[in-house]
């Protein structure tokens, strides 16, 4: 069923084609380990994609780079096919998966949870645009947008926003509000 499958396409550099199969199937490979990349990375150095691969009845990864696309397909983490073709598509990565129904009985995806998580990525990566089911998710102001989107009461003062190369802080005092259903009180 179409609602039980996921596909993701980005337009970054693409996973290096020589390491594509290992990057999605072998632990401790494919991560962004240098300090500059790690500051901006939101994830666990590829552990998640390897787990998704192992727990999927169908998993496909494509890396588009330099006029070539390398396509690898898997089932339950086992490599089924691996080929490289010419392409005119933009650089980037495509991943498709269908969770293994023998492991995940009667599973379903929760669109509101997925949208919230994707929105959180945009707060942490200002300017990143994500298209989810035809809806564009974008944060131009990072943590300021996070506060504005989640506060149920007006702050006592304008949001204070500090952003440096390695840190971003946004805060404002409020008298009484709920933030993501958690009640907060002040004296």
Protein language model regions, located:
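Conserved, well-structured core domains of diverse proteins
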Residues: 157-158
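Intrinsic-disorder/low-complexity loop/linker signature
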Residues: 134, 165-166
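N-terminal, positively charged regions that mediate nucleic acid binding
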Residues: 1
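Single conserved hydrophobic/aromatic residue that forms the stacking wall/gate
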Residues: 178-181, 185-187
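GHKL-type ATPase core
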Residues: 4-14, 18-19, 30-153
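Short beta-strand elements
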Residues: 167-176
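A short catalytic or substrate-binding loop motif that flags glycine-/basic-rich loops and adjacent residues
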Residues: 161-163
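ATPase catalytic-site recognition across NTP-hydrolyzing enzymes
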Residues: 21-25
């Amino acid at each position: 069923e179409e609602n039980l499958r996921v596909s993701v396409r980005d337009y970054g550099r693409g996973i290096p084609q020589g390491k594509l199969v290992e990057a999605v199937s072998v632990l401790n490979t494919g991560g962004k380990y240098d300090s500059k990349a790690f500051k901006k990375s939101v994830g666990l150095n590829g552990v998640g994609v390897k787990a998704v691969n192992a727990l999927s009845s169908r998993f496909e990864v494509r890396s588009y780079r330099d006029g070539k696309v390398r396509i690898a397909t898997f089932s339950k983490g086992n490599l089924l096919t691996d080929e490289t073709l010419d392409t005119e598509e933009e650089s980037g990565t495509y991943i498709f998966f269908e969770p293994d129904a023998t492991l995940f009985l009667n599973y379903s995806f929760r669109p509101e949870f997925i949208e919230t998580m994707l929105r959180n990525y945009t707060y942490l990566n200002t300017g990143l645009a994500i298209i989810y089911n035809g809806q564009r998710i974008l944060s131009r102001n990072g943590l300021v947008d996070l506060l504005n989107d989640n506060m149920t009461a007006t702050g006592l003062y304008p949001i204070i926003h500090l952003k440096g190369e390695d840190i971003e802080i946004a805060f404002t005092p409020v008298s009484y509000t709920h933030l993501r259903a958690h009640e907060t009180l002040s004296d």
